Regions:
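Short, small-residue-biased leader/transition segments that mark boundaries at the very start
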Residues: 2-3
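A structural motif at transmembrane helix-loop-helix junctions in multipass membrane proteins
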Residues: 18, 22-54, 69
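Residue-level hotspots within the lipid-embedded alpha helices of multi-pass solute transporters
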Residues: 21-26, 61, 80, 111-116
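Junction motif at the cytosolic side of a transmembrane helix
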Residues: 34, 38, 113-149
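Membrane-interfacial segments
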Residues: 39, 43, 70-71, 94, ...
Length: 149
């Protein structure tokens, strides 16, 4: 039965969980840093953070689906989406028997690459966003900030 799967908590599982936690923390911190550079007050920040919360909650619900069938092709591809990787990989690693190293290391690689790219984009937004204090940007304007030199 799908609901009677055993959770395997061994040393490698723990190490991978720490790695995905740290990568997810840095990734979402970068997203919130970009958000902080674009807003001037807490009220504006609450308005802009809704999409970030939706991605996180969506990943949370997807995690339960993946926990039922962690070795499917769909679970593999979902685990490569950086917004969902930290949560989905917790489920895949804990429930899969054995841990599939190729998918796990590929997820780590994609997460590292997307985090580096995100930090680069956030640094551009932050540089311009700090200078534009008092002006409420749109999403389209934030994309223009990325292209500024």
């Amino acid at each position: 039965d799908v609901y009677k799967r055993q959770i395997h908590f061994t040393a490698p599982v723990f190490v991978f969980m720490v790695v995905f936690f740290l990568l997810g923390f840095v990734f979402y911190s970068g997203l919130y840093a970009a958000l902080g550079a674009m807003v001037n007050s807490e009220d504006e920040g609450q308005q802009f953070q809704t999409p970030l919360i939706v991605f996180f909650i969506l990943g949370y619900f997807i995690m339960f689906t993946v926990a039922r069938n962690p070795d499917t092709v769909r679970a593999f591809w979902i685990s490569l989406v950086p917004f969902f990787t930290p949560l989905v990989m917790f489920a895949r690693i804990a429930v899969s028997d054995p841990i599939l190293p190729s998918g796990t290391f590929l997820s780590i690689f994609v997460m590292i690459l997307s985090t580096i790219l995100l930090i680069w984009v956030v640094s551009k937004i932050y540089r311009v966003g700090i200078l534009m204090y008092g002006k409420k940007p749109s999403f389209k304007e934030a994309l223009k900030w990325i292209r500024y030199k």
